[in-house]
Each structure stands twice: as structure tokens, then as C-alpha cells.
């Protein structure tokens, strides 16, 4: 009898233990961070040698009577006239001409504010609330925007970042594109390029939301932005814990997914900001919440804090002389770009305009001339080309892939019919990943979108 009682008691105790042991946690489900992947494939190209041209390599070097060899999508060699041509290569006489890396525009709205500029195609600002990190510019980009081909043929632009507008404090994700004809935006997406997040400070969010419930002041802008980062930090903590230990999956929030990507260092901040004091505040905020600002865009007062930008490894994305169109753009100077460069910071020329993007070489020429007139040391055409290719590639997180003519990098380059710092020079031929996308002498190599076919001005080169 005693044996039976002991056995029953043991069974009861074991049953109790089983009842209180929690079930194993479910394994965490990984979120697909790239649901709209690039489908880009490079166009076919040929092993090519350009010989006898003046070469700007994008790293500050000028080579007179230079030679550039590229094939299989990449730069093979860059040097002087002594470089031997590989067997079977296509030879191009570059005498009297210039070769440069393809221009990279880090601030464009081609595709989300396309031509023709009708309200039905105006898709750059989701102005329904000041915090919209959940929207993605690529979902507005129209690949048939005629501006893409104009930027290529008139401007030698081979890569560009398409941003949301600046109505919102958090405007949404940007996308980096190869400037190639494609039926879908995914067919243009630069493989491996990180996403960006457009942020804005200053007048634009105040103007848009001042009568819509706010914010209506600069301090309101900052308060809303800080509160949003607090939410993002909490969201990140929940998801980090879940991905480490499993269990019940936290609720998804597309806006917070983007901000978590920033806090994880996977998404780069591109911050619309004009005034020096506001840029300094944004830098302090980035340190408060643990993220890094990749670039300030427009940055007309960058010259006032160039040392601060250099110390924090932040690029300034600037115009040569476009200012005074609103109060926060008033206190600009024409020497802004060369002064930022001279301080050791990352200086970039940008367009923010469908016409300027066709003449970024001329914008750099103006900034260079203004810097030389001011007596800023160390400036040259070869150095200024860094503002058009190398530094933009750095700001987009693709410097290991493009931005300069170095062996192994993607063969994105332009053959100019003269000095590209002259108003009278223009692209003669353009290659992207070693594929010739434009030849001024061959009408068949002037990309025209399907939208333009059969319309007046089809494929015009101005």
C-alpha cells in the first residue's frame, strides 16, 4: 500500500512539473529587408581602349595623353600612353578629348517629379503627415521619364539617387539607380546600393504643416523628430530581442522598419538642411539617438561649419550659386563648395533639378572658378571632379563599386568632346558598366523612352 501511495505522489509531482514548464519559444521569423530587389543586368559591351585623351580619374589625378582600358563591365587599366592594348580590343582615338568617371547626382527627383510636369505625375511628397518614413521613392519613380535620357546624353550622368521631396520631417526612402533604359524601376536599381532616408529641417515642414496641426516652428520640428526616434529605439529593442530569443513576434510597422534600418547602420541619412545652426542641431540629435548623418543636402551655409562636417564625416551636397529663393537660403556664398573641400570635408555638387542635372559639369566649373578667384589653395579641374563622382559615390555607399577610374571598379565613364569644364563641351560617348549607352555620332545609340516614341521632340539632344 505504501508503495502505491509513493508512486501516486511521484506521478502527481511529475505531472505538476510538466504543467508548469513553458512550451518552447517559436523560432524568430526573419523579415525580408529587400522585397523589391534589383533586376538590373548590364547591357553587353566590348573590350575597349581609349587612347590619347586627357583623363580625370575621379581621385584628383589628371593624366595627359592618357589611356583607359575597360571590358567585362569593369575598368581594366588607367595610365599613360605606354599602356599596351589587349588583343581584340576596340580602339578609340581620344586625342583632343577628355575621359572622366560618369557623373553621379545624389539629389534628383527624376521619375517621381517627371516630365511632363503635370499634377497627375507629381509623386514626390506624401504630404499627409510630417512623419512618413514608410514611403519609398522607388514606388513613385516612372522609368519612362524623358529626363533620364537627357541626363545621360547631355550631362554624362550614369548614376543618380532619387529622393522623396522635403515637405516632411521624415520623407521616406530614397533609391539609387543606374541611368539605363528599363521597363521597371527595379531594372534600374543599382545592385547592392543601400537605401537612403530623406529627412528635412527648417522652412519646408513648417510651411506645409503649420496650418495642419503642426509642427509650425523649428522647435516643433525638432520635438517631433526626437519623439519619432524615441519610438524607433523602442521598436528596435523589441525586434532585436525577438530575433535573438524568438517567442511572440512584435507587430510590424513599416515606418519603424525604415528607422530601425537607420539605427542598424543599413540605411543612410540624407538630410535636407540649409542653415548652419540647424545642421549642428541635427548632428547633436544623431548622437543623442545613435545614428550617423551621411549628407546634408543643399547646405548653403555649410561653409560656416565646414570643420564640424569634416570632424563628423558628413558630406555637404551643394549648388554652385543657386540661393536667395527663400530666407533659409539667403546667406549663401559662391565659394561654399571649395571652402568645404578646403576644410577636408566631403564636398558634392548636386542638381535637384531636371535641367541642372544636364549641366553638373558646368556647375562644378563655376564652383571651381569661384574658389580659385578667392585664393583657396589646392584646387584644380582634376580635384573638382571628385565633387562630381568620387564624393557622390561615397555618400551613396557605392564608392567600392564606382565613382573613380580604378581597376576593378565598374566601367562608368564619359568621353567628352573637349574640356568638360568648358561651357562648349558635351558628352560624345557614355558607358555604364562598360556598355556604350550613348554615342553622339550614332542615332541608334540615343536612348528614347517608349513614352516619347512618335512625339514631337523625340529623343532630342539640347
Model-derived regions, located:
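Divalent metal-coordination and catalytic microenvironments
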Residues: 53, 68, 73, 96, ...
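Polyanionic/metal-chelating signatures
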Residues: 147-297, 426, 432
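Sec-dependent signal peptide recognition
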Residues: 1-7
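Histidine-rich, glycine-flanked metal-binding segment
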Residues: 31-35, 40-46, 55, 59-100
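C-terminal motif of bacterial Sec signal peptides marking the signal peptidase cleavage site
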Residues: 15-16
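His/Asp/Glu-enriched, well-ordered alpha-helical/loop segment
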Residues: 39, 44, 115-116, 122-135, ...
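C-terminal cap of metal-dependent C-N hydrolases
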Residues: 53-56, 394, 406-450
